[in-house]
């Protein structure tokens, strides 16, 4: 399988959304950029902020859509077209209600699971054949409480667990960038097994 050329963090722009559960994807690419000493700059034709980094000898783009979560696909598809990147060479990092904080999972293809950034991207692409990094934020217990939950900030313990999951994912990223997704999945899923209970 081809390696990665684009990593997209899904989230909402603006300081009021910083470090909310819904912005776990933004946090992931922010940490990647910080570790690489790269800075995000606004790219208006791509409707988002971009940075270029190198992992495992491969240069790749980071993207944070500035469209708000529900319209993320506009930015993602513009970037794929502009940089001539296949969807299979892209990884979308996003918050995942169905996983506890401290857990991260890699996945290829599948549905959107109610995640609006994925939903919009899949609608515009016409399929879901791209890689996803699902960063667990936990579930509030009832669907009526989901919106305030995702738009709120996690408590100290959950926030630290989300940070650990992001670090775990970054540790296996060189394998994914090189195209060895099976090994990356195996290592990531082993490294944070039972994370929800630590």
Residue spans of the language-model regions?
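Nucleotide and nucleotide-moiety/phosphate-recognizing core
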Residues: 1-109, 119-133, 140-145, 152, ...
């Amino acid at each position: 399988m081809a390696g990665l050329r684009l990593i997209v963090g899904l989230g909402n722009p603006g300081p009021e959304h910083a470090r909310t559960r819904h912005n776990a994807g933004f946090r992931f690419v922010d940490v990647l950029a910080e570790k690489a000493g790269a800075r995000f700059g606004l790219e208006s034709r791509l409707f988002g902020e971009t940075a270029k980094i190198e992992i495992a000898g491969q240069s790749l783009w980071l993207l944070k859509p500035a469209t708000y979560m529900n319209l993320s696909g506009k930015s993602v598809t513009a970037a794929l077209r502009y940089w001539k990147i296949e969807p299979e060479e892209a990884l979308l990092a996003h918050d995942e209600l169905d996983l506890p904080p401290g857990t991260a999972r890699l996945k290829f293809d599948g549905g959107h699971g109610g995640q609006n950034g994925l939903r919009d991207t899949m609608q515009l692409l016409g399929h879901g054949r791209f890689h996803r990094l699902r960063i667990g934020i936990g579930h509030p217990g009832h669907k009526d409480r989901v919106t305030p939950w995702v738009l709120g900030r996690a408590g100290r313990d959950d926030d630290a667990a989300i940070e650990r999951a992001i670090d775990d994912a970054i540790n296996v990223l060189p394998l994914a960038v090189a195209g060895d997704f099976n090994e990356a999945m195996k290592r990531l899923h082993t490294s944070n097994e039972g994370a929800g209970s630590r």
